Curated annotation (Swiss-Prot):
GO annotation, cellular component aspect: large ribosomal subunit
Protein name: Large ribosomal subunit protein uL1
PROSITE patterns cross-referenced by the UniProt entry: RIBOSOMAL_L1 (PS01199)
Protein purpose: Binds directly to 23S rRNA. Probably involved in E site tRNA release. Protein L1 is also a translational repressor protein, it controls the translation of its operon by binding to its mRNA.
DNA-binding recorded as keyword: no
Organism for this UniProt entry: Pyrococcus abyssi (strain GE5 / Orsay)
């Protein structure tokens, strides 16, 4: 693993300051990290990436998951109290772009049984793809979704596309500074692992709450 460009204490200090500078709100604010990159040509497709990162301390809040399935997979989803979208409902949603957009916005993650993926790609691909929310695919015989769901609850999806900056949620203001800092380290390590020249391509890192100002992590 590459040497971290920032030590843990510097990250903890930035988290502490970001939380302190956030005005109290009537909701629990998320904490986000923004990683600015340099010396990277995003016109070359091989330099762009999508990543799934499992945060050691989770996201600190509930994650909304929908399951697109019939049969065994749908039953497994209902047992876990997850929202289920049947193949028939999928056909209905396909007729309404407004409904499809609403669906893509409402859920953080989708799980889908493999046989429905061609339809999902056709009907929902243009709404889920740009949001980096294409489903986790499972076989139609799967009867236990719990391991996948537990992993998704701790997962963040990040992508580097047209601009040299990567954003990721890394917790909430109610989590300890150390927990958030460790989550940030995990995200940074994942990003460094995708960069051709590793940590030397990280220009700066900022931490902020949903409504608060961005605080730079001192290098």
């Amino acid at each position: 693993m590459s040497r971290m460009p920032f030590d843990r204490q510097k990250i903890v200090e930035a988290v502490k300051e970001a939380k302190a500078r956030a005005k109290p709100r009537n909701f629990t604010q998320s904490v986000e990290v923004a990683v600015n990159l340099k010396d990277i040509d995003l016109k070359r497709p091989e330099n762009r990436f999508k990543l799934e990162v499992v945060l050691p301390h989770g996201r600190g809040k509930d994650v909304k998951i929908a399951v697109i399935a019939d049969g065994a997979v749908a039953e497994a989803a209902r047992r876990l109290g997850l929202d289920v979208i049947s193949s028939a409902e999928l056909e209905e949603i396909a007729q309404s772009p407004r409904q499809a957009r609403k669906l893509a916005k409402k859920y953080d993650f989708f799980i889908a049984e493999a046989p429905l993926m061609p339809k999902i790609g056709r009907y929902l691909g243009k709404y889920l793809g740009p949001r980096n929310k294409m489903p986790v695919v499972v076989p139609p015989t799967m009867s236990n979704l719990e391991p996948i769901v537990e992993k998704l609850k701790k997962t963040v999806r990040i992508q580097l596309k047209n601009n040299p900056v990567v954003h990721a949620p890394v917790g909430t203001e109610k989590m300890s500074d150390e927990e958030i800092a460790e989550n940030i380290e995990t995200v940074l390590n994942a990003i460094i692992g995708k960069l051709e020249r590793g940590e030397s391509q990280i220009k700066s890192v900022y931490v902020k709450t949903t409504m608060g100002p961005a605080v730079k992590v001192k290098g």
